[in-house]
Amino acid sequence: MNQNIEKRLFTSESVSEGHPDKICDQISDAILDEVLKQDKNAKVACEVFTTTNYLLIGGQISSTAIVDYEQVARDVLKKIGYVDDAYGINANTCKIDIKIESQSPDIAQGVELSNDQIGAGDQGIMFGYATNESKTYLPLAITIAHELVYNATSQRKKGLFKWARPDMKSQVTIDYTNINNPKIDTILMSIQHDPNYNEIEFKKYIKENIMDLVAKEFNLNTDFKVLINPTGRFVIGGPQGDTGLTGRKIIADTYGGYSRHGGGAFSGKDSTKVDRSAAYMCRYVAKNLVAAGLADKIEIQVSYAIGISQPISIFIETFNTHKVDLNTIYKAVYENFDFSVSSMIKTLDLKKPIFFKTSKYGHFGKKDLSWEKLDKIEVLKEYKKCS
């Protein structure tokens, strides 16, 4: 490591939709969406556990919706490509247990308040972040890491990526030594494969048709260090290789460790759970502030108490990149954004069944998500004039 002692290297990781934890996230959000299609006011907290050819679906769901949870789970597995016992779980043969109950009435009385107000479903802290270092206003490392496993999965599903199986991970190290010209230092990919495969051809395909392809998409270098399946073999994968659980990839789901995280997971939770809705709102606000030019980087923290609709606190960090006085940024936030639970749900249209698409390859950076819209730029630019 001596040769890198003066380098500024930052690393983030992502996982494919076939990773055991992501299987669980997708099933949790697929169930949430199916419930919301029938009952937009449903209260959902759904979690999934998986191991070799087995799923356990549990949680609390209060709703008038009638949903075949088992069928939803099997459909998700089929979409991923888990239709072979050798892969670690098989949509057609796996055992599924259902342990779903109704929401606690003690929680319900704190959520449903008068005058159309909604109390926070729990206490907690949430963060949102944006940076102008990429077109999606996300850090480069996590953005590239997502694209690698997304691209590899797409090629596998199309039959182009020979020998590949569903379970994959990526890890990207960005060299920020020249802060104005970041480059890729290292890419690591671990990709499950068939037992009878040509290792040299497999790795060559990954470097040329996945790693290099993605690097070029971002107009970045292709002379990075390469690590592919460092143990030498990755046949046993999926839930057979590791157990999976909803909510265990919260850093890959957000900013790849580049920003702080409050600890609350997203998948399987309806929008009255501020772990999800407030984190989305913080991202929405931070992204619009950065896009409006008020700072190069912004991180927003909020906190809530169960049963109370308004946040307990709001904190804004710009990492000394603000272009206007920090008090002006606070003023812009307080005058243009409402962090009450009911307002966040309305602003971001969070009663719609939109959550399955967030359950893989990150909850941020996708254009068609409401919290990614840039509809406050012009009004926020006005604050640059009065600073």
Curated annotation (Swiss-Prot):
Claim: ATP-binding is one of the keywords in the record: yes
Gene Ontology BP, a term: one-carbon metabolic process
Origin: domain of life: Bacteria
Pathway assignment: Amino-acid biosynthesis; S-adenosyl-L-methionine biosynthesis; S-adenosyl-L-methionine from L-methionine: step 1/1
EC number(s) reported in the record: 2.5.1.6
Gene3D superfamilies in alphabetical order: 3.30.300.10
Keywords: ATP-binding, Cytoplasm, Magnesium, Metal-binding, Nucleotide-binding, One-carbon metabolism, Potassium, Transferase
Keyword Transferase attributed: yes
Gene Ontology, cellular component aspect: cytoplasm
UniProt remark on cofactor binding: Binds 2 divalent ions per subunit. Binds 1 potassium ion per subunit.
Residues given in the record as ATP binding sites: 19, 167-169, 233-234, 242, 248-249, 265, 269
Ligand binding (L-methionine): 103, 242, 273
Protein name (Swiss-Prot/TrEMBL): S-adenosylmethionine synthase
Organism annotation: Mycoplasma capricolum subsp. capricolum (strain California kid / ATCC 27343 / NCTC 10154)
